[in-house]
UniProtKB/Swiss-Prot annotation:
Keywords: Antibiotic, Antimicrobial, Defensin, Disulfide bond, Secreted, Signal
Assigned GO CC terms: extracellular region
Chain positions covered by the region annotation Disordered: 109-146
Ligase in keyword set: no
Organism: Hylobates lar (Lar gibbon)
Primary location group: secreted
Compartment(s) of residence: Secreted
Protein name per Swiss-Prot or TrEMBL: Beta-defensin 125
Pfam families membership: Defensin_beta_2 (PF13841)
InterPro entries: Beta-defensin, Beta_defensin_dom
Disulphide bonds in the chain: C27-C55, C35-C49, C39-C56
Domain of life: Eukaryota
Length: 146
């Protein structure tokens, strides 16, 4: 009986010590794949392991291996604003434009002045142009027109 107990202990220790044990060897990054002769339906072939085995990685997303990174914690005390470049910051969304003075354009070239409330007429630019149109030489016109 002592010999039988000794045999069971040795067999138990051998299964713990053996490298292959009873599961297929692991492969890929962080040992998430398994080396098999043929990948299962829920697995994808990635690369070749030793002894002509395929490294198979599961297609189904496992949150054990693919964890999302934690969101950075932002404390309101850490946020500072620098208003040194703004001269007069009022906190309102109004622009620095003054809406008290408006120019009413009634006709082309005629505007109302806000001080006297009289129309001023400005002459539009003259339409006479003194540009000469030159024709290219006949040799170049034959090249440009097909």
């Amino acid at each position: 009986m002592n010999l039988l107990m000794l045999t069971f202990i040795i067999c138990g220790l051998l299964t713990q010590v053996t490298k292959g044990s009873f599961e297929p060897p692991k492969c890929w990054k962080n040992n998430i794949g398994h080396c098999r002769r043929r990948c299962l339906d829920t697995e994808r072939y990635i690369l070749v392991c030793r002894n002509k085995l395929s490294c198979c990685i599961s297609i189904i997303i496992s949150h054990e291996y693919t964890r999302r990174p934690a969101f950075p914690v932002i404390h309101p005390e850490d946020i500072t604003f620098d208003y040194s470049d703004v001269d007069s910051f009022t906190g309102s969304p109004v622009s620095m434009l003054n809406d008290l003075i408006t120019f009413d354009t009634t006709k082309f070239g005629e505007t109302m002045t806000p001080e006297t409330n009289t129309p001023e007429t400005t002459m539009p630019p003259s339409k006479t142009t003194t540009s000469k149109t030159t024709m290219p030489p006949p040799s170049q016109t034959a090249l440009t027109h097909n």
